[in-house]
Amino acid sequence: MELAVQTQGLGKRYGRAWALQDCALEVPAGRIAALVGPNGAGKTTLLHLAVGLLRPDAGEVRVFGRDPRAGTSVLADIGFVAQDTPVYRDFTAAELITMGGKLNRRRWDAALARERLAALGIPPDKPAGKLSGGQRAQVALALALAKRPRLLLLDEPIASLDPLARREFMQALMGAVAESETTVLLSSHLLADLERSCDYLVVLQQSRVQLTGPVDELLETHRTLVGPRAGSEAVAGVAKVVRASHTERQSTLLVQRGDGPIDPLWTEHEVTLEDLVLAHLAEADARVTAEAWGVPA
């Protein structure tokens, strides 16, 4: 299995605080991977390390087996759209495409960028600063795709867009990826958009990877159980209780399934991606808080 992104013991520190710590991660080539976590979890730091904008303070990161800081030949395989989809606001879309060609002489598909923006109705002669937020995001995506990258890194590119612009951006992204078989690592808070488009999941919390794997496998191995008020006793067929809530008469558990059937006293329900992510984030928060106080989680 070819790996698009691989990290081992990866860490980045700002002063005494670790923005990312002991990060062990593998993203297989050909996947559309969602990178999820709260503000401050380390998502942007991870992406900046993967694109070579930062130097690790610990461990290593590899993109298709190579150090992203090793030279321009590695960077030629990486497309990157940063937060707020920055583009030169005084340049027109046509001028940005021309500039991109001069900066990426090894491989640049200007025709692809022009065709994509024309199909979206974005004028070639209007300064980027006068385009809408959604249009600027589409320009940034078109420029990244014009590199014909093997890996596309997107750092919350749709966070500030309205629902229609978000949908148009994600549709454009999915169409482009289907044509090119590009691997995507997409950071976002918008779980509903990710559930419709991503087939691989990476959850970051407290500067560490908390959960990773193919979305379909993770959803298959997790369930919500509703049943009689539970104490500390184990539930048959459950490997791990990720999150629990209780009323006087019943308990609701989000669990990782184990071997064998679930105890028939419990009603079993499928989980959504949002259920899964929020439960693991809450578990990580509770564990770190308990460790800080020196009490059992």
Where are these regions (language model features)?
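Conserved ABC transporter NBD signature motif
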Residues: 59-74
